[in-house]
Amino acid sequence: MVIKAKSPAGFAEKYIIESIWNGRFPPGSILPAERELSELIGVTRTTLREVLQRLARDGWLTIQHGKPTKVNQFMETSGLHILDTLMTLDVDNATNIVEDLLAARTNISPIFMRYAFKANKENSERTIKNVIESCEALVNASSWDDFIASSPYADKVLQSVKEDNEKDEAKRQEILIAKTFNFYDYMLFQRLAFHSGNQIYGLIFNGLKKLYDRVGSYYFSNPASRDLALRFYRQLLETCETGQREQLPVVIRHYGMESAQIWNEMKKQLPTNFTEDDS
């Protein structure tokens, strides 16, 4: 087992998760005692205790006072955030996870957008317009750096879009443009979900954010993906402005089908880091 981590806690967390996944600590089993496990992993008991508590919160483990720590049937006890972890563990199934994500978004979007356009029409229009303006400025800018220099939302973008220390300038531009476009795509769906008035829809997107960023940062490296998304955003704006909410299922389903066609081509040449754990 080769594990890359930036800290002892990160190493311990990955060690335990991979051991659960690979059957060393299978679901339903009991973890070794704290002292034994800390020596096995090579971290302090304090660090291990913090990691175990975090994994328990995430649904991997059940900690009971005075009893051994039990490994859960994690697919029954974990939330949406586990999907990004599964991308790094189950590499052969990664494209299926992406397709599940796209299908789920297509299925729920007509529901929350209809509510958003009815209950929060003005805020919904503002959100879509801001995303369109920002994405148009991004794709028309001479470089990502020029876009950031002129963007009124630069601070927010830079909080989410991180540099990868890419030395090749052309690749750096491609990576940053894709990440930034994805930042706005996520913003559009997540904010419209909250505009619906049902916070559950917004929280679903919060739970998917890490996976969304992983997928979108690759998907939006394709100019065709960005062009298609912008056309979709403009259709959404028109639908919101005219009040023709009954058109939403058709508009969203059509976008889902077209974006799936692009993805089906892109998944044939996935980058080597697509399923890497970068934490």
Swiss-Prot record:
Positions of disulphide bridges: none
Domain HTH gntR-type: 6-74
Organism phylogeny: Bacteria, Pseudomonadati, Pseudomonadota, Gammaproteobacteria, Vibrionales
Gene3D superfamilies in UniProt: GntR ligand-binding domain-like, Winged helix-like DNA-binding domain superfamily/Winged helix DNA-binding domain
Name used for this protein in its record: Fatty acid metabolism regulator protein
Keyword Translocase: no
DNA-binding span(s): 34-53
Top-rank lineage group of the source organism: Bacteria
Stated role: Multifunctional regulator of fatty acid metabolism.
UniProt KW keywords: Activator, Cytoplasm, DNA-binding, Fatty acid metabolism, Lipid metabolism, Repressor, Transcription, Transcription regulation
Gene Ontology cellular component terms for the protein in this record: cytoplasm
HAMAP family reported for this sequence: HTH_FadR
Pfam family, one: GntR
Primary location group: cytoplasm
InterPro entries reported for this sequence: FA-response_TF_FadR, FadR_C, TF_FadR/GntR_C, Tscrpt_reg_HTH_GntR, WH-like_DNA-bd_sf, WH_DNA-bd_sf
Compartmental location: Cytoplasm
GO molecular function (one): fatty-acyl-CoA binding
Any single biological process term in GO: fatty acid metabolic process
Self-association state and partner proteins as the record states: Homodimer.
